[in-house]
Curated annotation (Swiss-Prot):
Domain notes: The LysM (lysin motif) domains are small globular domains involved in binding chitin in eukaryotes. LysM3 contains one LysM domain.
Keywords: Chitin-binding, Glycoprotein, Signal, Virulence
Domain LysM span(s) in chain numbering: 33-81
Species the sequence originates in: Penicillium expansum
This protein's name: Secreted LysM effector LysM3
């Protein structure tokens, strides 16, 4: 009986040890243990599943790209669950600026990360990797505090009131000149034909100037419409979100078939659009892309989903 109790206690201790997750450790080359944030993740759940604390997560990610703290986690982001060098952020197929442009290599100095692939002068790089001048681009709440601050010009101004004033002033001067020119007309000795010619000439100049000023169109202002994030799904050829991948994003169901299912090889548009569905096939570690029709991958092994829901079904 005593032996049975000892064996039972040993089994219980073994199960308890197995149930307690071992804390993640850095890789052999000094990088932190990388974790991909999933839907509905919280720091509390992540910490419990990996045998660490929320304070550990905050500490490990002080230098992680776009880290805003445990209160603001973004699905699909890479974070650290151990000490070590932070990972490069996930490449975004539609990115044209910042470190998430596909093919961007890790900088020798991590402090230079935010300045990689900069926008043209006077434009800001938004956290989703595109350039613009409106507040949604320039109030980049996800850029690390140490990153460079973009210099932004104000919105295009409407025609200044000075131009209007000059027009009025010009008109006033001409009125004065007209009045001054009309003084000789009050002289009975002046010839009527001379007066008529002068009045006509002044009137013509005034009308021409006024008409030209009135037709000047105001400069177009920058649209302030809010940016709407599309749903995105990235399907990888290997486990752990590695290898070649499909990247799809969209706003509506215009390109879905009658069964409500996306056809990866159904001629989906490969150019970015703000209204439809886009599909690209990325190869060579994200350096090159082609249409999804050119891929032969039929069974993706892992995926990342943003701004949407995913359901998996088993079938024969």
């Amino acid at each position: 009986m005593g032996l049975f109790r000892i064996d039972f206690l040993a089994l219980w201790l073994l199960l308890l040890r197995l149930a307690t997750a071992a804390a993640p450790v850095p890789t052999k080359d000094g990088f932190c243990f990388k974790y991909i944030i999933q839907g509905y993740d919280t720091c509390a759940l992540i910490a419990k599943a990996h045998g660490i604390t929320e304070a550990d997560i905050e500490s490990f990610n002080k230098n992680t790209w776009a880290w805003l703290g445990c209160g603001r986690l973004y699905q699909g982001d890479f974070i650290c669950l151990s000490t070590g060098k932070p990972p490069m952020p996930m490449a975004l197929p539609q990115a044209t600026c910042g470190p998430q442009v596909p093919g961007t290599t890790r900088p020798a100095n991590w402090a230079n990360l935010a300045g990689m692939n900069p926008c043209a002068e006077s434009k800001c790089c938004a956290f989703w990797g595109q350039c613009g001048v409106t507040d949604i681009y320039c109030q980049n709440c996800r850029a690390p505090p140490a990153g460079p601050t973009a210099t932004v010009k104000g919105a295009t101004e409407a025609p200044k009131s000075q131009t209007s004033s000059n027009t009025k002033a010009g008109g006033a001067n001409q009125s004065v000149n007209t009045a001054a020119g009309s003084k000789p007309t009050s002289n009975p000795n002046s010839k009527s034909n001379t007066t008529t010619v002068k009045a006509t000439k002044i009137t013509t100049i005034t009308k021409s100037s006024t008409t030209t000023k009135a037709k000047a169109a105001p400069e177009p202002s920058v649209s302030q419409s809010p940016w709407t994030a599309p749903w995105e799904i990235t399907l990888y050829s290997k486990m752990g979100c590695e290898g070649d991948y499909y990247h799809l994003e969209g706003y509506n169901k215009e390109f879905l078939d009658n069964k409500g299912c996306l056809n990866l090889h159904g001629g989906l548009n490969s150019k970015f659009t703000e209204t439809g569905v886009t599909c690209k096939w990325w190869t060579d570690d994200g350096f090159t892309w082609s249409s999804c029709d050119s891929s032969k991958l039929m069974k993706p092994q892992s995926w990342i989903l943003k701004n949407g829901y995913c359901s998996a079904f088993m079938f024969d």
